[in-house]
């Protein structure tokens, strides 16, 4: 089962490294920070960079959440497995399916999507957003970002993914 670990936003990579160093690997199958690719213009050149898909959260795949949570106390950074009272709540099947379909690679990274502008419509031509245009709530062309509204952790959240709009047509 997959569980969400809440961490301080911007410290996902640091906490991830500390968990891998500190927590007994027998307690979990995998722990990761889902990411997305986007483009940034640096010194006039477009560079592909990555950023957290779910800022402030890590995902752990474990069948021993009690043992993992106990081991997680060894980590010096602020960490909390999401749950209610004394039980931990795993990600639902749709949440796991969404994450897995978007990040279907060993690095758990959502690749860059590309699109063209036809009149006042944006048409996705390639990438993971091709089958999920309905999730797009807004687009920032200048920053090559699409903002998605999804159900995750029992509530509606807005997240970003990379979207390069190549040219205008029509």
Regions found by a protein language model. Give the residues of each.
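Short, conserved beta-turn/loop elements at beta-strand boundaries and strand-helix junctions
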Residues: 127-129, 139-144
């Amino acid at each position: 089962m997959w569980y969400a670990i809440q961490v301080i936003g911007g410290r996902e990579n640091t906490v991830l490294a500390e968990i891998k160093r500190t927590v007994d690997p027998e307690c979990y199958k995998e722990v990761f920070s889902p990411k997305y690719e986007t483009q940034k213009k640096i010194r006039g050149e477009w560079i592909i960079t990555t950023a957290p898909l779910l800022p402030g959260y890590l995902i752990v795949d474990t069948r021993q959440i009690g043992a993992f949570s106990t081991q997680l106390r060894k980590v010096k950074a602020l960490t909390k497995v999401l749950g209610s009272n004394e039980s931990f709540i795993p990600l639902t099947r749709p949440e796991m399916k969404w994450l897995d379909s978007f990040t279907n690679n060993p690095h758990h990274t959502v690749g860059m999507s590309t699109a063209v502008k036809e009149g006042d419509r944006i048409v996705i031509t390639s990438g993971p957003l091709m089958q999920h245009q309905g999730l797009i709530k807004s687009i920032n062309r200048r920053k090559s970002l699409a903002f998605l509204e999804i159900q995750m952790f029992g509530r509606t959240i807005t997240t970003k993914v990379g979207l390069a709009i190549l040219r205008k047509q029509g």
